[in-house]
A protein has these predicted regions:
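Short loop/turn microsegments at loop-to-beta-strand junctions
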Residues: 31-33, 44, 156-157
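N-terminal nucleotide/polyanion-binding subdomain common to many enzyme families
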Residues: 27, 126-161, 167, 175-176
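Short, basic/aromatic recognition patches
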Residues: 10-26
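Zn2+-dependent cytidine deaminase-like catalytic core
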Residues: 37-138
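Short, compositionally biased leader-like segments
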Residues: 1-15, 128-133
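Small-residue (primarily alanine) positions within well-ordered alpha-helices
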Residues: 16, 20, 57, 61, ...
Length: 209
């Protein structure tokens, strides 16, 4: 039976989610992720993922905390990654730093992670829990989650009406990794009653926590 989350757990996870939001428009194709390290009720380090290829949220928080990370609890908006990409696995960094507990808002659906991050932490003796404020965490990365789960881009269709000649224009917006930060372009019109077209955008690539 899992241990219920405390009021403090909710507070610090909400903080991690707010940090993750700072990656809006910059993390593509990676997901937006925030991390808060807490020891004895005090925040000792925090961070958020800024751009693909740059340090992940957990690594930034660990660097800020230094030795204070030992025995701390890490609140992460997405399960720590467990695979080697352009950056090393965050799960290994948390273990090496001596973090005692990891709370993830949700598990990472990326096939390269898919529970392996939390499993590796648990096997190393780190207490793990997942599912705190999960719905809010999912809202951060609709494009990334759709790609990982269905192999499809996240697309938003917008309509606007030109009152001058009552023509309707459409704009297709294709979300990338964090989903939702990249967009498409629009078409233009010509003289003498000429027409225009909509534009579109797409996303690709994988992501890490």
């Amino acid at each position: 039976m899992s241990t219920p989350f405390s009021a403090a757990d909710h507070e610090f996870m909400a903080r991690a989610l707010r940090l993750a939001e700072r990656g809006l428009y910059t993390t593509d194709p990676n997901p937006r992720v925030g991390c808060v390290l807490v020891r004895d009720g005090q925040v000792v380090g925090e961070g958020w993922h800024r751009r693909a290829g740059e340090p992940h949220a957990e690594r930034i928080a660990l660097a800020a905390a230094g030795e204070a990370a030992r025995g701390a609890t890490a609140y992460v908006s997405l399960e720590p990654c467990s695979h080697h990409g352009r950056t090393p696995p965050c799960s290994e960094g948390l273990i090496a730093a001596g973090v005692a507990r990891v709370v993830a808002a949700m598990r990472d659906p990326n096939p390269q992670v898919a529970g392996e991050g939390m499993s590796g932490l648990h096997e190393a003796g780190v207490a793990t829990q997942a599912g705190l404020l999960e719905a809010a965490a999912e809202e951060l990365n609709p494009g990334f989650l759709k790609r990982m789960r269905e192999g499809l881009p996240y697309v938003c269709l917008l309509y606007t009406s030109d009152a001058a000649d009552d023509r309707t224009w459409g704009l297709l917006w294709g979300g990338g990794g964090g989903g939702d930060g990249g967009g498409g372009g629009g078409g233009g019109g010509g003289g003498g009653g000429g027409g225009g077209g909509g534009g579109g955008g797409g996303g690709g690539g994988g992501g890490g926590g």
